[in-house]
């Protein structure tokens, strides 16, 4: 076990939209340390969103994130020799992390030709409260609701 908790690294806001969440999205899209490529993908997707909706892409992205981020999740807790799925509230930092992780993972598995297209379409779907990322959130909430009986095991 580690002696003390690792300090949180400071993430700088991205230069184009001046948003920390956009920087975290770029970091999540990035593969093999190629931040330039990841930034092109994200900014290209945002440009597509702007062309498709005519709205500010940052606002569309924030709406999408609100629709993706979970409020509750289940955690395994061992009590008396059996494991229970205990519903717990998700901390704000983890909400954002899970939302970004689900968004990028699901965008990668979509069928469109380029990652830019996939990301743009998934963000638009999420902003309209449809799409696989929103379904993932609903499934997580359903699991928490189904295991509500074990909420008293919360720690």
Curated annotation (Swiss-Prot):
Keywords: Ribonucleoprotein, Ribosomal protein, RNA-binding, rRNA-binding, tRNA-binding. GO terms for biological process: translation. GO terms for cellular component: small ribosomal subunit. One of its GO terms (molecular function) is tRNA binding. SUPFAM superfamilies: Ribosomal protein S7. Disulfide bonds: none annotated. One of the primary rRNA binding proteins, it binds directly to 16S rRNA where it nucleates assembly of the head domain of the 30S subunit. Is located at the subunit interface close to the decoding center, probably blocks exit of the E-site tRNA. PANTHER family: RIBOSOMAL PROTEIN S7. Belongs to the universal ribosomal protein uS7 family. Part of the 30S ribosomal subunit. Contacts proteins S9 and S11. This is Small ribosomal subunit protein uS7. It comes from Lactococcus lactis subsp. cremoris (strain MG1363). The lineage of its organism: Bacteria, Bacillati, Bacillota, Bacilli, Lactobacillales.
């Amino acid at each position: 076990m580690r002696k003390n908790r690792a300090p949180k690294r400071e993430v700088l806001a991205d230069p184009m939209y001046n948003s920390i969440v956009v920087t975290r999205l770029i970091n999540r899209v990035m593969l093999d340390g190629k931040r330039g490529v990841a930034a092109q993908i994200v900014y290209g997707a945002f440009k597509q969103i702007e062309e498709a909706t005519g709205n500010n892409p940052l606002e569309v992205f924030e709406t999408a994130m609100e629709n993706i981020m979970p409020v509750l999740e289940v955690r395994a807790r061992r009590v008396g020799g059996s494991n229970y799925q205990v519903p717990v509230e998700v901390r704000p930092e983890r909400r954002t992390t899970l939302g970004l992780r689900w968004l990028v993972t699901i965008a990668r598995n979509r069928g469109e030709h380029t990652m830019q297209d996939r990301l743009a379409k998934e963000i638009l779907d999420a902003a309209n409260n449809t799409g696989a990322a929103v379904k993932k959130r609903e499934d997580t909430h359903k699991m928490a609701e189904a295991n509500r009986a074990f909420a008293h095991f919360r720690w």
